[in-house]
Amino acid sequence: MLRLVGYDARSQILEVVFNTGGTYQYKEVPASEYERLMSSESIGQYMHRHIIDRYDYERIN
């Protein structure tokens, strides 16, 4: 599902590249949320349950 995940703590932007090729930036994601994402058993499931429908986002490609 996910190819790459990056996070900028200063701007609180979570950037995700999906296997389908789409790159999305999720806005105002707290560092604690990013930490939970990265330590979760399944990053894909965590994205669906806690991030995708809860944070504003923009597709950048």
Across the structure, where does each feature detected by a protein language model lie?
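Acidic/histidine-enriched, beta-strand-rich ligand/metal-binding domains
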Residues: 1-61
